């Protein structure tokens, strides 16, 4: 799921993704936006 959070690295996405999807959520930075996924 792409969320509306700007990023330059996946680390910036980890907290917002975990806040939204819980502690097991993963995060990537794609095209300057965060992408969250559940494992």
UniProtKB/Swiss-Prot annotation:
The record marks 28 as: Basic residue of the functional dyad. Negative results: does not inhibit calcium-activated potassium channels (KCa3.1/KCNN4) of human T-lymphocytes. Does not inhibit voltage-gated Shaker potassium channels. Does not inhibit Kv2.1/KCNB1 potassium channels. The record marks 37 as: Aromatic residue of the functional dyad. It comes from the Eukaryota. Blocks Kv1.3/KCNA3 voltage-gated potassium channels of human T-lymphocytes (Kd=0.25 nM). Has the structural arrangement of an alpha-helix connected to a beta-sheet by disulfide bonds (CSalpha/beta). The modification Asparagine amide is found at residue 39. This is Potassium channel toxin alpha-KTx 2.9. Disulfide bonds join 7-29, 13-34, 17-36. GO terms for cellular component: extracellular region. Belongs to the short scorpion toxin superfamily. Potassium channel inhibitor family. Alpha-KTx 02 subfamily.
């Amino acid at each position: 799921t792409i969320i509306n959070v700007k990023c330059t690295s996946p680390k910036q996405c980890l907290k917002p993704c975990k806040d939204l999807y819980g502690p097991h959520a993963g995060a990537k930075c794609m095209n300057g936006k965060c992408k969250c996924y559940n494992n």
